[in-house]
């Protein structure tokens, strides 16, 4: 298996739910800016909303750093909308919620659990050239922290133009 770190983000085209509307998101939308792909197992679960709301509460900080967040699960964009409509906490999310019901994007980035039809908790920070600069993969019972992700993005952005260790 080829290492994914420093590789080019694969091509993709998926449906998404954002701010009350459906839209298509492709890898081309990520070019020219920093992006985070934030994979989680499923909508309507217990740990996932805590992570997604944590990201939503720090969304302005990420945006101030020139970063767009894209959450991704194997749920459809219709399920994302239903969860958004049903949950007061999920309504705080302003970033695109990407739908990968076939698991194609999850498989391309190595986070798909075949037996369960869902993703691991995977985080990918992508630079403006489309290269994956940070990879984090957790078992699904281990949540993530948006403050730590802010630190990692800051470090990745600082690395540009600097000598490597």
Residue ranges and their predicted role:
Residues 1-162:
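Chalcogenol-based redox active-site neighborhoods
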């Amino acid at each position: 298996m080829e290492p994914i770190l420093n590789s080019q983000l694969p091509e993709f085209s998926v449906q998404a739910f954002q701010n009350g509307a459906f839209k298509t998101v492709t890898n081309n939308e990520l070019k020219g800016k920093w992006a985070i792909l934030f994979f989680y197992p499923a909508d309507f679960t217990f740990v996932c909303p805590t992570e997604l709301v944590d990201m939503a509460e720090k969304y302005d900080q990420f945006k101030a750093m020139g970063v767009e967040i894209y959450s991704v699960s194997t749920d459809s964009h219709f399920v994302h909308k239903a969860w958004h409509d049903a949950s007061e906490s999920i309504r705080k999310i302003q970033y695109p919620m990407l739908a990968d019901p076939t698991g194609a994007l999850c498989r391309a980035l190595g986070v798909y659990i075949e037996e369960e039809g869902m993703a691991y908790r995977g985080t990918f920070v992508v630079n403006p050239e489309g290269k994956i600069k940070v990879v984090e993969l957790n078992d699904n019972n281990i949540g993530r922290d948006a403050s730590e992700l802010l630190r990692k993005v800051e470090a990745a952005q600082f690395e540009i133009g600097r000598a490597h260790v």
